[in-house]
Curated annotation (Swiss-Prot):
Domain of life the protein comes from: Eukaryota
Family, similarity comment: Belongs to the enolase family.
Record field: catalytic activity: (2R)-2-phosphoglycerate = phosphoenolpyruvate + H2O
InterPro entries: Enolase, Enolase-like_C_sf, Enolase-like_N, Enolase_C, Enolase_CS, Enolase_N
Any one GO molecular function term: magnesium ion binding
SUPFAM superfamilies found in the cross-reference section: Enolase C-terminal domain-like, Enolase N-terminal domain-like
GO terms for biological process, alphabetical: glycolytic process
Annotated organism of origin: Hevea brasiliensis (Para rubber tree)
This protein's UniProt keywords: Allergen, Cytoplasm, Glycolysis, Lyase, Magnesium, Metal-binding
PANTHER family named in the record: ENOLASE
Co-factor remark: Mg(2+) is required for catalysis and for stabilizing the dimer.
Subunit structure: Homodimer.
Protein name from the UniProt record: Enolase 2
Pathway: Carbohydrate degradation; glycolysis; pyruvate from D-glyceraldehyde 3-phosphate: step 4/5
Length: 445
């Protein structure tokens, strides 16, 4: 007898920021229960699929009871009797038939909510792996038609600024990538050691308070100069003895400080802001180029506003060979926006966030499209996370080559890194760590 879905239930749980989010349980006819929870971002791109929130005064408007109800009343009953291994069929059914809402960038999930659809999509994927009797990462690889499993290079967000932190720093994330490690296990060692050295460097320079951690486990010292963040990383990497082996990545999240006057305000968090730090896209572009010359930077994410295609393309053509230019708010994991960016040569790497697009199938499509264009792919958490580890398996199964899921601190971040350690151990001699090939770990599939 074929194993089928017998029930789908959702509930409201809490993310790592104490805000409500959606968790779904998919129960199968053999008694197996697959469970998945969705994350939520702080700096969200305006083109992301619609996340349904209740509004009103409960939970300060952030409740998800409507999304939960949509799973329990609309999606759940409609999936009973379906084959959990048919990921594409189930995702398309939810997105195109049960929801059916469309905007200029495709299926926008406005009726049921991307958070409702995704929770079920992730749980169905876990259920499908169970039915096939294979680990989740292998099931994901099979769904994508990928033959090569690869452990990603972790990009640890160790200094927080932007919308993630209460300091004056405009740029949102300063990351370390252990590209010189020979395994994921060694990469974790390097990352953790640099993190602890960074903590003592910051404590010595700015005092104990500066070592409090932000939403993603990174430190948020009260510095204003973005260059100072890079300097701290360089020092910590050297103190740990990993110069040349651990390199730097940045997530600028520039949409957060882009004004209607088309300037970028590096002073946007200052209360008495007199506009003295407002700069043009060209000046900002040259600032990045100076950073790249002075520091071992291999990756810059969201360097410009999500609609500033012109400066994205300029930066990519000028430094794209040496540095990956990652589209997050620009692309929002949306296949149509990825297509546009490929055509306009706007960037050369995709940030993969399943909750930006709202289904496993569409996420896989965005990744395949990116890889065929010769781009890099970085799987990513959100700042409001849960203990769910789906993205760890997703990253290995799709051979993204890179993953960012916070600092080596805070359990909702370590949950993903620890899962990757388990996967590497399980693969044994077959385990491949992306290392220096993090931008193109496998041939396109």
């Amino acid at each position: 007898m074929a194993i089928t879905i017998v029930s789908v239930r959702a509930r409201q749980i809490f993310d790592s920021r104490g805000n409500p989010t959606v968790e779904a349980d998919v129960k199968l006819s053999d008694g197996y229960l697959a469970r998945a929870a969705v994350p939520r971002g702080a700096s969200t791109g305006i083109y992301e699929a619609l996340e349904l929130r209740d509004g009103g005064s409960d939970y300060l408007g952030k409740g998800v009871s409507k999304a939960v109800e949509n799973v329990n009343i609309i999606i759940g009953p409609a999936l009973v009797g379906k084959d959990p291994t048919d990921q594409v069929g189930i995702d398309n059914f939810m997105v195109q038939q049960l929801d059916g809402t469309v905007n200029e960038w495709g299926w926008c999930k406005q009726k049921l909510g991307a958070n409702a659809i995704l929770a079920v999509s992730l749980a169905v994927c876990k259920a499908g792996a169970h039915v096939k009797g294979i680990p989740l990462y292998k099931h994901v690889a099979n769904l994508a038609g990928n033959k090569n499993l690869v452990l990603p290079v972790p990009a640890f967000n160790v200094i927080n600024g932007g919308s993630h932190a209460g300091n004056k720093l405009a740029m949102q994330e300063f990351m370390i990538l252990p590209v010189g490690a020979s395994s994921f296990k060694e990469a974790m060692k390097m990352g953790a050691e640099v993190y602890h050295h960074l903590k003592s460097v910051i404590k010595k320079k700015y005092g104990q308070d500066a070592t409090n951690v932000g939403d993603e486990g990174g430190f948020a010292p009260n510095i204003q100069e973005n260059k100072e963040g890079l300097e701290l990383l360089k020092t910590a990497i050297a103190k740990a003895g990993y110069t040349g082996k651990v390199v730097i990545g940045m997530d600028v999240a520039a949409s957060e400080f882009y004004g209607s006057d088309k300037t970028y305000d590096l002073n946007f968090k200052e209360e008495n802001n007199n506009g003295s730090q407002k700069i043009s896209g060209d000046v900002l572009k040259d600032l990045y180029k100076s950073f790249v010359t002075e520091y071992p930077i291999v990756s810059i994410e969201d360097p410009f506003d999500q609609d500033d295609w012109e400066h994205y393309a300029k930066l990519t053509s000028e430094i794209g060979v040496k540095v990956q230019i990652v589209g997050d708010d620009l692309l929002v994991t949306n296949p149509k926006r990825v297509e546009k960016a490929i055509k306009e040569k706007a960037c050369n790497a995709l940030l993969l966030k399943v909750n930006q697009i709202g289904s496993v199938t569409e996420s896989i499509e965005a990744v395949k499209m990116s890889k065929r264009a010769g781009w890099g792919v970085m799987a990513s958490h959100r700042s409001g996370e849960t203990e769910d580890t789906f993205i760890a398996d997703l990253s290995v199964g799709l051979a993204t080559g890179q993953i960012k899921t916070g600092a080596p601190c805070r359990s909702e971040r370590l949950a993903k890194y620890n899962q990757l350690l388990r996967i590497e151990e399980e693969l044994g001699a077959e385990a491949v760590y992306a290392g220096a090939n993090f931008r193109t770990p496998v041939e396109p599939y």
